[in-house]
């Protein structure tokens, strides 16, 4: 426990929380344009070809965003909406593309967990 004299000399420091998605700049989502769409392989125990896109945001930042779901129509110059959220087995991928908005269509034939993949309720 510090003395009052010590606190006067050196005030208590505020603990600042560090954001995990800094390029969004405090916004829940950001719009961006795909500059490259490609696949990468995950970290060690896992094996796959994960679909990712390099996106230039309206704020000027260039980020790598994951394309969730099976099948996608994203290509170069597609306008997409990006949200925060990392992919644990892809180093450097800290963002997700939001399906079902702008140029990213929803996942075809999706029945469960539809809201996460931008799919309307089937009739």
From Swiss-Prot:
GO molecular function: rRNA binding; structural constituent of ribosome
GO annotation (BP), single: translation
One GO cellular component term noted in the UniProt record for this chain: chloroplast
Main location: plastid
Residue ranges crossing the lipid bilayer per the database entry: none
Compartments it resides in: Plastid, Chloroplast
Keyword Protein transport in record: no
Keyword terms: Chloroplast, Plastid, Ribonucleoprotein, Ribosomal protein, RNA-binding, rRNA-binding
Superkingdom, natural source: Eukaryota
Annotated PROSITE patterns: RIBOSOMAL_S12
Gene3D superfamilies tied to this protein: Nucleic acid-binding proteins
NCBIfam families: rpsL_bact
Description of how the protein assembles with itself and partners: Part of the 30S ribosomal subunit.
Family: Belongs to the universal ribosomal protein uS12 family.
Function: With S4 and S5 plays an important role in translational accuracy. Located at the interface of the 30S and 50S subunits.
Name the record gives this protein: Small ribosomal subunit protein uS12cz/uS12cy
């Amino acid at each position: 426990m510090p003395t009052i004299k010590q606190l006067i000399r050196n005030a208590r420091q505020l603990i600042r929380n560090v954001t995990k998605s800094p390029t969004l700049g405090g916004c829940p989502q950001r719009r961006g344009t795909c500059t490259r769409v490609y696949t990468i392989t995950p970290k060690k125990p896992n094996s796959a070809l994960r679909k990712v896109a390099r996106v230039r945001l309206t704020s000027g930042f260039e980020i790598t965003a994951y394309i969730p779901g099976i099948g996608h129509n994203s290509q170069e110059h597609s306008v997409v909406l990006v949200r925060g959220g990392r992919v644990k087995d892809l180093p450097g991928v800290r963002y997700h593309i939001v399906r079902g908005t702008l140029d990213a269509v929803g996942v075809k034939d999706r029945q469960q967990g539809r809201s996460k993949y931008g799919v309307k309720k089937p009739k």
